[in-house]
């Protein structure tokens, strides 16, 4: 009697265990993979531009962009009258008051040295000086000077010009840029000759 009851108990317990195992959810075998970014082919995206369709007889004009061109400025060295100061007035005053005056013109830093004795005037002196300056090899090679070369020209404009009359001890000291144009930056002007009358203390110079 005891053995059949024990056997029945074991059978019922085994059936409960099997039922419990079947009811448990099985883990999913599908592995989750991280999302991958889209593969870029390395080619830039090209936006297609709409084409232009022309009807018979129609035309399209295309104008290319023009770049601003800089026209070179030609170097012109000419006599500057009147100069930056009253130099020309004093020279013409000395000519009118000192008989048979012979002028000596020197620019030591440029090795320029000449005399004007026949019909002297400030115009003649400055024109001759301008010709001597233009004959300097460095100046003569500058047809269309660059910005750096114009800076060098400006430095030359600061050298002293000695104009004097040895017989009477009269002298006048000017800058080269006072009597010769062409040393200005950035524009190189051309100044027309103009001599004014004698003024100021030139008679006593």
Swiss-Prot record:
Q: Tell me where the signal peptide lies.
A: none
Query: Any one Gene Ontology biological process term?
Result: symbiont-mediated suppression of host innate immune response
Superkingdom of the source?
Answer: Viruses
Q: Where in the cell is it found?
A: Host nucleus
UniProt keyword terms in alphabetical order = Host nucleus, Host-virus interaction, Inhibition of host innate immune response by virus, Suppressor of RNA silencing, Viral immunoevasion
GO terms under cellular component: host cell nucleus
Where is this protein primarily located?
host cell
Q: Where is this region: Disordered?
A: 23-52
Q: Which family does it belong to?
A: Belongs to the cucumovirus/ilarvirus protein 2b family.
Its name, as the record gives it, is Suppressor of silencing 2b
Q: Which organism is it from?
A: Tobacco streak virus (strain WC) (TSV)
Q: What is the lineage of its organism?
A: Viruses, Riboviria, Orthornavirae, Kitrinoviricota, Alsuviricetes
């Amino acid at each position: 009697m005891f053995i059949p009851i024990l056997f029945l108990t074991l059978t019922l317990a085994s059936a409960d265990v099997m039922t419990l195992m079947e009811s448990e959810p099985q883990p999913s075998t599908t592995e989750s993979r991280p999302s991958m970014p889209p593969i870029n082919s390395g080619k830039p995206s090209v936006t297609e531009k709409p084409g232009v369709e022309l009807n018979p007889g129609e035309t399209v004009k295309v104008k290319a962009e023009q770049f601003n061109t800089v026209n070179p400025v030609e170097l012109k060295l000419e006599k500057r009258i009147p100069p930056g100061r009253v130099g020309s007035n004093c020279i013409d005053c000395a000519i009118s008051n000192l008989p048979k005056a012979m002028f000596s013109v020197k620019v030591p830093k440029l090795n320029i040295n000449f005399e004007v004795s026949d019909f002297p005037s400030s115009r003649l002196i400055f024109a001759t000086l301008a010709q001597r300056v233009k004959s300097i090899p460095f100046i003569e090679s500058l047809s269309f000077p660059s910005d750096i070369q114009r800076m060098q020209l400006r430095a030359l404009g600061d050298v002293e010009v000695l104009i004097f009359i040895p017989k009477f001890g009269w002298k006048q000291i000017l800058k080269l840029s006072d009597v010769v144009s062409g040393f200005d930056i950035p524009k190189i002007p051309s100044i027309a000759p103009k001599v004014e009358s004698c003024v100021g203390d030139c008679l006593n110079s």
